[in-house]
Amino acid sequence: MERVARLAARERSELFAESAARMGTTPAVVEKDFWVSWVLRCLFADAQLANWLMFKGGTSLSKAYGLIQRFSEDIDLVLDWRTVSNADPLAKRSQTQQNKLNADIEAEAVRFIAGELLGRIRPVLGELCVCEVEVNDAHVINVRYPAAFPDAYLRPEVRLEIGPLAAWLPHELRRVSCYAAEQFPAVFTQRDFEVRVIRAERTFWEK
């Protein structure tokens, strides 16, 4: 995927347009799916980020399991609570104590996301994308990618929605691909990649 990400803009555009024609969708959809997948690959190829984060949510059901047909614009991630607290949020305590701990963990998570996490993600993604914390939501990092196909309904950004209080278990390793690689596998030196993901049954249960 890295090779495709670094193709000349014209070559990338042709790949996405041809893939879209085969699929009966718009090039902007194929383009955004590529960048969602590329961001996922970069995050979980980095040892530090892979230790901090876990893939979850509806996007995981479509991208990692193929259980729902859904075009995914956002990436839901669980932040390992141990990065922001020494106290186990699952330990027995009073409701008042639990509420205080949850608030403390959330506050530390906001600090961590804007500091260490963003500071790690930026060099991992490199100069191809611009990464910023969402102005109106401190749990979101927006990754702006080099869009070639303007679309009134698709922002040229991948939203990383990050929370520390979601369940971490059960999880497993799954392989993920993108639309363009499925249509033109010969263009990709690596058609798919591995991510650590909350298992589908847990995600369905939470929904």
Task: Please state what every model-predicted region is.
Residues 11, 17-18, 32, 37-41, ...:
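Catalytic cores of NTP-dependent nucleotidyl/adenyl transfer enzymes across multiple folds
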Residues 2, 20, 39-41, 45, ...:
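Residue-level detector of functional hotspots within protein domains
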Residues 44-75, 79-87:
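Active-site nucleotide-donor binding segment shared across nucleotidyl transfer reactions
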Residues 1-38, 66, 85-97:
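N-terminal regions immediately upstream of nucleotidyltransferase
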Residues 66-68, 72-73, 83-99, 161-180:
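Hydrophobic transmembrane alpha-helix bundles
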